[in-house]
Curated annotation (Swiss-Prot):
It comes from Bos taurus (Bovine). This is Tubulin alpha-1C chain. Tubulin is the major constituent of microtubules, a cylinder consisting of laterally associated linear protofilaments composed of alpha- and beta-tubulin heterodimers. Microtubules grow by the addition of GTP-tubulin dimers to the microtubule end, where a stabilizing cap forms. Below the cap, tubulin dimers are in GDP-bound state, owing to GTPase activity of alpha-tubulin. The gene is TUBA1C. Its EC number is 3.6.5.-. It catalyses: GTP + H2O = GDP + phosphate + H(+). Pfam families: Tubulin, Tubulin_C.
């Protein structure tokens, strides 16, 4: 089996975790108490969903997941919520005092008290796996736990499980709206620390999802529940190939092989289509060509940046539902003729396709319409550098005046770590710039063809 362990860190991670596991349960027909009425084989069934759920002797399905937060309130909601019977109590780990939006608290002071307990739980989950494939880590960049504790955890996971892939789903600070003043500090510190430990990080920014909810679903004032449900659809599409059988299945390592041209350039953009409300879906025929086109619209992306200014290095299209390869090939051929979509010159083919016959499931009473087919596009584009540049600029403005730095130093960090992290980010921006530059400039390599 190719099992995956999900680790949800901090408030953002835990709440996205709630949305994701709710959706997985609906997709697999697992009830909130972990029973699966349709499943006849109790015990070691090697159905695909066993990559995400382990089965007890009593026929109960338990998520292979750990929820961690340094303060109790958010995890207490899981402990008392609808799915409280789904999780083993030891999978829900909460501390006593939170990281107070402070990377240093999450990484050094408070984080180190709880890290061994967390690794212990992860080890227990890993021991139940026959062939652990890797970890999915959900967190935000801006929070103290999400940034500080995640980076500590990633470092330790690299030590304990060196070769296993680690994928991140990170909530990137939105350009306009902000949940914390020190977000730029936390984001840059955590990116610097986890850069060498993470194999692939899917970034999502809240503002982009707000706009999608407002524009496509006509929700005037989207709540975090709306955002998380939309996000869980994306996570579900990315992991669908691990949980269901399909025509072209994609596993975790396959993503990395196809999306990450250089180890540092591992921040693909996610785009999902169709995001459409039930009233509208009733009147629309969403063909494969239409939803594929929608993926290349900047408006449907999960991070605010404009790929029309950047170049694509690689692109994964993950279809699910009623989709046949012929339609996909036709849709991709059409896209390749469009001049607005530019690939770097050293990557001529650029499209990887996965097809899964399980149609997308929606949460009853949610905002998304039930559709026959959907697609999630993961693209590695140089436009992500815009997002980094924006963040670096905010960091510079604050750091020039050393604003708020004393909170970090007071928790045992050194000021040198800030400048070191900032230099690393500058290098990352430079890397993106170089990757996008044409390879044949100035030298006569073109003669061989």
């Amino acid at each position: 089996m190719r099992e995956c362990i999900s680790i949800h860190v901090g408030q953002a991670g835990v709440q996205i975790g709630n949305a994701c596991w709710e959706l997985y349960c609906l997709e697999h027909g697992i009830q909130p108490d972990g029973q699966m009425p349709s499943d006849k084989t109790i015990g070691g069934g090697d159905d695909s969903f066993n990559t995400f759920f382990s089965e007890t002797g009593a026929g109960k399905h338990v998520p292979r997941a750990v929820f961690v937060d340094l303060e109790p309130t958010v995890i207490d909601e899981v402990r008392t919520g609808t799915y409280r019977q789904l999780f083993h109590p030891e999978q829900l780990i909460s501390g006593k005092e939170d990281a107070a939006n402070n990377y240093a608290r999450g990484h050094y002071t408070i984080g180190k008290e709880i890290i061994d307990l967390v690794l212990d739980r992860v080890r227990k989950l890993a021991d139940q796996c026959t062939g652990l494939q890797g970890f999915l880590v959900f967190h935000s960049f801006g929070g103290g736990t999400g940034s500080g504790f995640t980076s500590l955890l990633m470092e330790r996971l690299s030590v304990d499980y060196g070769k296993k892939s680690k994928l991140e789903f990170s909530i990137y600070p939105a350009p306009q709206v902000s949940t914390a003043v020190v977000e730029p500090y936390n984001s840059i510190l955590t990116t610097h620390t986890t850069l060498e430990h993470s194999d692939c990080a899917f970034m999502v920014d809240n503002e982009a999802i707000y706009d999608i909810c407002r524009r496509n679903l006509d929700i005037e004032r989207p709540t975090y529940t709306n955002l998380n449900r939309l996000m869980s659809q994306i996570v579900s599409s990315i992991t669908a190939s691990l949980r269901f059988d399909g025509a072209l299945n994609v596993d975790l390592t396959e993503f990395q092989t196809n999306l990450v041209p250089y180890p540092r350039i591992h921040f693909p953009l996610a785009t999902y289509a169709p995001v459409i409300s039930a009233e509208k879906a009733y009147h629309e025929q969403l063909s494969v060509a239409e939803i594929t086109n929608a993926c290349f619209e900047p408006a449907n992306q999960m991070v605010k940046c404009d790929p029309r200014h950047g170049k694509y290095m690689a692109c994964c299209l993950l279809y699910r539902g009623d989709v046949v390869p012929k339609d996909v090939n036709a849709a991709i051929a059409t896209i390749k003729t469009k001049r607005t979509i530019q690939f770097v010159d050293w990557c001529p083919t650029g499209f990887k396709v996965g097809i899964n016959y399980q149609p997308p499931t929606v949460v009853p009473g949610g905002d998304l319409a039930k559709v026959q087919r959907a697609v999630c596009m993961l693209s590695n584009t140089t436009a992500v550098a815009e997002a980094w540049a924006r963040l670096d600029h905010k960091f510079d403005l604050m750091y020039a005046k050393r604003a708020f730095v004393h909170w970090y130093v007071g928790e045992g960090m050194e000021e040198g770590e800030f400048s070191e992290a900032r230099e690393d980010m500058a290098a990352l921006e430079k890397d993106y710039e170089e990757v996008g530059a044409d390879s044949a400039e100035g030298d006569d390599e073109g003669d061989e063809y």
